[in-house]
């Protein structure tokens, strides 16, 4: 096993993840831990209703990389043409200020929880440019199955 992708990791106490990671490290110290965190607004909503929701900064204590859901809402607004790219870049700058220096975010245009990018960004050049941009951002790039073929359905 190379690693674990932990679904909605923000809603599980970080102390559990730290214990799980230590137990796995005793067997495989090179195991990679990927946290699917939650959109910032969803984490805030959960907290307002008394539901535990760890911040991305807290989750990084136990994980090697996280989905970029903390800035995903702004990125989606950019993809829909609602805000300029500079707004998303400002959000990325915020990540630089609030996470550990070695933080690693999983950058993506689509995944199993998101609509296919080609279903709403119809300009092929824009798809190519947005995909290329991911490779120049700090973090790890995810190309979801079929994205390279401009699939517009699940």
Q: Which residues fall in each region the model found?
A:
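Active-site-proximal helices and loops of the catalytic beta/alpha 8
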Residues: 7-100, 105, 122-124, 133, ...
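Short catalytic-loop micro-motif centered on adjacent basic/acidic residues
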Residues: 3-9, 117-118
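Loop/turn elements at helix/coil->beta-strand transitions in domains of secreted/extracellular proteins
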Residues: 1-3, 28-32, 138-142
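Short secondary-structure junctions and interdomain/linker hinges
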Residues: 95, 99-102, 115-116, 138-141
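Short, acidic/polar
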Residues: 1, 125-131
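Substrate-binding cleft of secreted/luminal carbohydrate-active enzymes
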Residues: 131-152
């Amino acid at each position: 096993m190379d690693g674990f992708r932990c679904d909605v990791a923000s809603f599980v106490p970080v102390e559990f993840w730290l214990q799980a990671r230590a137990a796995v490290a005793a067997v495989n110290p090179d195991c990679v831990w990927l946290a699917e965190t939650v959109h910032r607004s969803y984490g805030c909503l959960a907290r307002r209703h008394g539901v535990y929701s760890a911040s991305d900064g807290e989750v990084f204590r136990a994980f090697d990389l996280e989905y970029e859901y903390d800035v995903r809402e702004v990125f989606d607004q950019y993809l829909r043409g609602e805000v300029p790219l500079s707004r998303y870049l400002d959000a990325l700058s915020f990540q630089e200020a609030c996470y550990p220096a070695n933080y690693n975010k999983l950058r993506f245009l689509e995944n199993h929880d998101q609509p296919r990018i080609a279903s709403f960004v119809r300009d092929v050049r824009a798809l190519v440019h947005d995909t290329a941009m991911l490779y120049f951002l700090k973090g790890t790039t995810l190309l979801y199955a079929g994205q390279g073929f401009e699939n517009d359905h699940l």
